[in-house]
């Protein structure tokens, strides 16, 4: 019922998006920043796996001899504080400059002036940020979703129409283990993009980071077996990590619901502490941990806080995607 009421608003939103895209399609307002740009984004609100994909791209570029920087918008940040994604990237990619600002052109100018050795920029969530010219435009498609069921905001989750997929240089299917009909997904992407996906990937917990008053230790997934957990996932799809924890043998005794990017208030921290009295540990995502670490005193918390080490695992096409990315970057640098 609500979706039906919101459809007129979706039509208006679609008209605004179409007008904006038409302007950028002509090249008006597009800025060449002087550095090769690799954009990684999606068509929908909510998580499709951009953070692990951005980190994969950064590591792959470093391994190939490049010196990347990351520019992102910085959703959910408070004035004077870095965003969840910025903190997560900085923690995972030591030495990689990470700049958060709604003005990505200004961020890249700062990168060029303050980090002159950087030779490529990764735009985190850059598909709709069309003001920045890019050599590679990777679009992530969530394998957990059925493409033809998606609607435009606000009645649905689409930031722009599915036909916008055509402007991507490469499409990558994430969470591909959830694709019920691979042939149908492949055909749908070909019809919208003109080519099949360049790669398919899943998201896997490689290990766990256990935070306690004594510090942080890295342990294998087997550590979860038999543990009673309180979970709190401030992400778009909390069912995924909860299911992974239970698949690893953990028992979820309490779940604290939270919206995507939600900060931790003192009342919520107290609620988690209270629930954890009947648990062995609290499980949160990396995005949650960078916020929780600001407000929790591990010396008084009582139980460990566990953060999964999430990685991107390609089931097909990693070499193709990397080759295309490196080729485009090298052409721009010559």
For each feature predicted by the language model, list its residue ranges.
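Acidic beta-strand-to-loop metal/phosphate-binding motif
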Residues: 280-287
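Hydrophobic residues at beta-strand termini and immediately following loops
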Residues: 40, 99, 141, 201, ...
């Amino acid at each position: 019922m609500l979706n039906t009421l919101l459809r007129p608003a979706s039509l208006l939103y679609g008209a605004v998006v179409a007008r904006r895209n038409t302007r950028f399609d002509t090249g008006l307002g597009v800025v060449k920043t002087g550095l090769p740009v690799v954009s990684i984004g999606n068509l929908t609100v909510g998580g499709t796996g951009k953070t692990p994909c951005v980190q994969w791209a950064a590591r792959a570029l470093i391994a190939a001899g490049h010196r990347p920087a990351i520019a992102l918008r910085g959703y959910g940040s408070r004035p004077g504080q870095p965003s969840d994604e910025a903190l997560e990237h900085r923690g995972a990619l030591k030495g990689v400059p990470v700049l958060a600002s709604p003005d990505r052109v200004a961020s890249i100018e700062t990168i060029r002036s303050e980090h002159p050795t950087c030779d490529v920029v990764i735009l985190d969530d850059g598909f709709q940020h069309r003001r920045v010219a890019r050599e590679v435009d990777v679009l992530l498609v969530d394998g957990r979703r059925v493409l033809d069921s998606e609607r435009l905001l606000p009645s649905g989750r689409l930031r722009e129409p599915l036909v916008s997929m055509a402007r991507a240089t490469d499409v990558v299917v994430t969470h591909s283990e959830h694709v019920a009909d691979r042939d149908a997904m492949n055909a749908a992407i070909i019809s919208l993009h003109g080519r099949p996906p360049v790669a398919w990937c899943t998201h896997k917990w490689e290990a766990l980071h256990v935070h306690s008053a004594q510090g942080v230790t890295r342990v294998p997934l087997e550590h979860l077996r038999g543990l009673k957990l309180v979970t709190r996932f401030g992400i778009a799809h909390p069912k995924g990590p909860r299911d992974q924890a239970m698949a690893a043998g953990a028992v979820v005794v309490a779940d604290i619901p939270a919206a995507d990017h939600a900060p931790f208030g003192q009342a919520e921290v107290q609620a988690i502490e209270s629930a954890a009295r009947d648990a062995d540990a609290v499980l949160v995502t990396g995005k949650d941990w960078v916020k929780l670490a600001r407000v929790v005193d591990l010396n008084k918390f009582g139980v460990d806080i566990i953060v999964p080490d999430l990685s991107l695992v390609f089931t097909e096409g990693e070499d193709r995607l990397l080759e295309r990315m490196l080729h485009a970057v090298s052409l721009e640098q010559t």
